[in-house]
Amino acid sequence: MYFRITIPSLQDGKKDEAISFVKERVMTEFDNTPGLLSMTAAITGETSGINMAAYESKEAMESIADKIQTVLAEAAVFMSAPPVIYQGDAVFGKVYQTIGKDEKKPGYLRLVVGVAKDNDAVLNFIKEKVQPIYEESEGLQITGAIFDENTGISWSIWDSQAAMDEAATQLQNALDSESESDLFDGATVAYM
């Protein structure tokens, strides 16, 4: 499985237009695209959002690169700068709830980005410290992680903000106990 994560910075006052664009243009444009397994979009603030797409393979994503670029060019009218894009093979993840394509269910996304000092150490931290927190949590839908070179990106989607916030506190405590500076070059950034 291969992921592409796009993090746009939205212009002030453009959030509602961007939401409509994603619902009416992006989701319909990519519906039934061969090799595209899932697509998720979230607004993480008044001027920030996340689009995450899962593909069968890197080649499946590359086969629609022109379509992706066309839609990004159209979305530029909502952005204050070019989006940050991360891509990579899945290195961790689990589906806790199966949600059908046409099923409407709220989800609260938490995505964390950090520049890893050692990718293996960060992956071990996720498996040994983060996964047990996930396993004991209520309301978790899906988790995952990729590396784009030495940048680690992990995410989780929750049924409610309360469930996400409760887990986020435990996850931050785990990171603090491990010493974030031993794992990452600088602080991690969380989008929620």
Question: For each of these PLM feature ranges, what is it?
Answer:
Residues 1-50, 56-192:
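Short S/T/G/P-rich N-terminal loop/turn motif that feeds into the first structured element of a domain
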